[in-house]
Each structure stands twice: as C-alpha cells, then as structure tokens.
Amino acid sequence: MHIGQALDLVSRYDSLRNPLTSLGDYLDPELISRCLAESGTVTLRKRRLPLEMMVWCIVGMALERKEPLHQIVNRLDIMLPGNRPFVAPSAVIQARQRLGSEAVRRVFTKTAQLWHNATPHPHWCGLTLLAIDGVFWRTPDTPENDAAFPRQTHAGNPALYPQVKMVCQMELTSHLLTAAAFGTMKNSENELAEQLIEQTGDNTLTLMDKGYYSLGLLNAWSLAGEHRHWMIPLRKGAQYEEIRKLGKGDHLVKLKTSPQARKKWPGLGNEVTARLLTVTRKGKVCHLLTSMTDAMRFPGGEMGDLYSHRWEIELGYREIKQTMQRSRLTLRSKKPELVEQELWGVLLAYNLVRYQMIKMAEHLKGYWPNQLSFSESCGMVMRMLMTLQGASPGRIPELMRDLASMGQLVKLPTRRERAFPRVVKERPWKYPTAPKKSQSVA
C-alpha cells in the first residue's frame, strides 16, 4: 500500500469515527442527551464542539487542572472533523456558555444514583454508611463573581476572594458522592443539608459533625423515609431527660424543642426521643446522639467506633482539592454560571474516578476501593480517556477490561506502625543565619 492510500484510509476512518462511541463506556451518551433535553439545552445548528462532548471537556478540566481548556479538547479529540486540526480557545469558552450548569448538574445527579445503586456496598446492621460535611471553594475575583457570591467577612474585613459554600453526601466505604448542594456564604450548612434530605435513600445511617445539630433538621431527616438514621455529637450544654437505661453509657433520652424550631419545621413536635451514648476515646469522654433507638438491633458497643468513620469524607475532600485539583485553591471560571458548571464537573470527575476504582477493587481479593491509590487511579483514568480516542471500536472492550484489571498497580501498602515518636523539626532557611548570641544575665 502506498503512503497516500494509507493516509487517505486513516483520514476516512477519523471522519467516520464518533467520539461518543469510544467514551460511551464511561458515561452513557443517551443519559447525557437526556440530561441536555431535560435542562432545555438544545441547539439546532451543527457545531464542531457538540454539547454532548462538552460534558467530557468539563470532566477533563477537573482531571487536568494545569492544562488550558483548548488543550484538553485537543488531547481528548472530542471535536468533530473540520478544516482545522485544532480548536480555538474562544470556541471552547463559547461552547461552555452554551452548555450551562444545569445539564452538568443533572448528569452528576443521575450518574451518582446509577453508580451508587450498582455498587454492592458493605452494610452495618443493614444500613449503608453515609456522611455529610461542608467545604468552601474560592472563585476568581471578578465583578460578576463578586456580585453572585458575597465574600465572607472576618472582624468586619471582607475576604480576598468570593467563595462558594458546598455540602456533599458521601458513601464512606467507596467514597462515592451521592448528593451535593451549594450556595453562597450567606447560606448556612444546615440550609444546604436540608436540600439533601430527599436525595437520601432508605436504610441508611448518616454521620454528621456537631455543626449540623438541629432537632428540626434531624427529625425531618428521620421522617423522610424508612430507616433513615443519623448520628451526631451532643451539643455542649444541651438539656435532656433520661427515659430509661439501655446499658452502660447507653440511655434513651427525651429532648425538648424550642418554639422557633417548631415554627420553622411544621412536623416537629414538642419533644424528640433519641439515644444517647457515652464513649471514651483517647481519654476524652464523648456524647453521641442517634436516632437508632432499637437496642436489640443496633448494639451500643459498636456504635461508638462507628462514628470514627465520618473522617472518610474529610479524606475525600482532600483527594478532590489536593490530588485532583493539584492544590490550586482558586477555580478557573470567571462567571457565576461557569463556576457552578465547573463545580458540578469536579464532582462528576471525582465520582468517575471512584467508580473505576470500585471496578478495579472487584478484581482484588480482600481489598476495598478506599485501599487503592486515588492519585494513581486519577492519572490512569485520564490516560485511558486519551487512549480510547485513537483505538478502533473493536479494541475498546479489551482496553476497558485491562483498566479494570490494573488494580494491582494502584494497591496501597499496609500502613506501618510508627517506630519513633513524632518530632517537629525546625523549618529550613533559604540563607544561612548567624547563631544568636547568648544574652547576659543582669
């Protein structure tokens, strides 16, 4: 075959290749199209950057934090064939504006439910372990962002950047995000957590920190479905009445509600019945309040250690901000609509990596997804996304099986016990300094 015929064959193959075919094993193209239609984001004009493929640009933007947007589009090769081999930077920005944030939010919500239901999570007494917690995001200092996201003030002084407040719900054994809500700094975390009540499934136990202590919120959380339990530290100075003793450091208690809480939460009664556990951890006495009042089904001896798993969501935030975002604290987007789009894309990309880690953990006996390296898995998924575009359709299932079987490469070693006591060393100086002269005693 002559070189001209080979180039012509490659050109014809590239013009007929549909990017959705190769990336469809990660995100269902029909699901993306359905989310675009539900959000009202449609276009009649055939563009080189289709809205379906711009969702992948948002995912790549979260995985490749240091790369410009047009470089991500070119590396993923998600544009349709045209006269120019590459896409202009301005075209990517215009495509992001056409896409908006609602479509990306719907893609995240639907995939979170789909992947969560498809994963066989381990249970505790028939309950799935969840946790909610808040996180702040810093946006670029532009007039549009400043107007949409008010700054937080400290002692009357405004913060340096506009900020977004977000509350996420995470399944603790797989680190899959199941729901999220965000607003401005004027919104409290309790207000954002209230938006997650309807998205919480039945037969779950949600671990919360003391910032979410609100009897109205906790009561609404329990009444929203069947066996939707919660556990939270008891607020300091909270008044309660003991009903009966269930065991050592285990009591059934009754807490009175305030008129303000009953006015805000119509379904809240004058009293709330809960279970109070008193546990000692590292020499410190802790009081935990929970809705699991059935002492026969939920043993109190195990519940004290159960709350320590809430820290998994903090580790998940560290994976997102430090590993995936490369510790770049400020988002890219300079307009509020694109800020929301970028945040939904970050959560979608994190879940995408985590779901692939779940698939890899299925090939490892005795390993859970949170025992695999997130940073290695994150780079592996991005490399696979770029590899799929150049692969023939027949090899795509083989490549996906290879990725699922690569769990041996990302296993974390067993954490060793500390051999020496912790030592805080002096910070190294850039330039040598003269030793301090000893002061004479007068």
Swiss-Prot record:
Keyword DNA-binding among UniProt keywords: yes
InterPro entries on file: RNaseH-like_sf (IPR012337), Transpos_IS4 (IPR047952), Transposase_11 (IPR002559), Transposases_IS4_N (IPR024473)
GO molecular function, one term: transposase activity
Alphabetically ordered keywords of this record: DNA recombination, DNA-binding, Transposable element, Transposition
Any Pfam family the entry gives: Nterm_IS4
GO biological process, one term: DNA transposition
Highest taxon of the lineage: Bacteria
The family this protein is said to belong to: Belongs to the transposase 11 family.
Function summary: Involved in the transposition of the insertion sequence IS4.
NCBIfam families hit by this protein: transpos_IS4_1 (NF033592)
Protein name per the record: Transposase InsG for insertion sequence element IS4
Lineage of origin: Bacteria, Pseudomonadati, Pseudomonadota, Gammaproteobacteria, Enterobacterales
